[in-house]
UniProtKB/Swiss-Prot annotation:
Domain notes: The cysteine framework is C-C.
Cellular compartments annotated: Secreted
Function: Probable neurotoxin.
Tissue localization of expression: Expressed by the venom duct.
Listed GO MF terms: toxin activity
UniProt keyword annotation of Nucleotidyltransferase present: no
Region forming the signal peptide: 1-20
SS bond partners: C29-C35
Key words of the record: Disulfide bond, Neurotoxin, Secreted, Signal, Toxin
Keyword Lipid metabolism: no
Protein name, as recorded: Contryphan-Cal2
């Protein structure tokens, strides 16, 4: 695998993790800005 492919897969993985974290912690967020600070 090329380094570019590895970077793309890593980015996709991080985005997926961030999305699942948002779903899990959505009720803990008061505002959209605080939600983004969870990352």
């Amino acid at each position: 695998m090329t380094r570019t492919a590895v970077l793309l897969l890593t980015l996709l993985f991080l985005v997926a993790m961030a999305a699942s974290d948002k779903i899990k912690t959505r009720e803990l967020c008061w505002t959209e800005e605080e939600c983004e600070n969870w990352e």
